[in-house]
């Protein structure tokens, strides 16, 4: 729903959240910070997997 749309929009703006941003989002969406952190980690992993990157270090 609305939370998911907000998370996706935030992810499009930046794949990595600052601690301040994560805290603000958690408050705004009434989720805990761990949930948001994990959602972002999973989203990054899905994109990496979809792009066929075999070695995570290849991105750096």
UniProtKB/Swiss-Prot annotation:
Belongs to the engrailed homeobox family. The keyword Transport does not apply. Its main location: nucleus. Keywords: Developmental protein, DNA-binding, Homeobox, Nucleus. InterPro entries: Engrailed_Homeobox_TFs, HD, HD_metazoa, Homeobox_CS, Homeodomain-like_sf. SMART domains: HOX. GO terms for biological process: neuron differentiation. This is Homeobox protein engrailed-like. It is found in: Nucleus. One of its GO terms (cellular component) is nucleus. One of its GO terms (molecular function) is DNA-binding transcription factor activity, RNA polymerase II-specific. PANTHER family: HOMEOBOX PROTEIN ENGRAILED, HOMEOBOX PROTEIN INVECTED. It comes from the Eukaryota. Residues 1-41 bind DNA. It holds the Pfam family Homeodomain.
């Amino acid at each position: 729903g609305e939370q998911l749309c907000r998370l996706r929009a935030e992810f499009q703006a930046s794949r990595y959240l600052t601690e301040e941003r994560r805290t603000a989002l958690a408050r705004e969406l009434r989720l805990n910070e761990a949930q948001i952190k994990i959602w972002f980690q999973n989203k990054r992993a899905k994109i990496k997997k979809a792009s066929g990157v075999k070695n995570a270090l290849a991105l750096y």
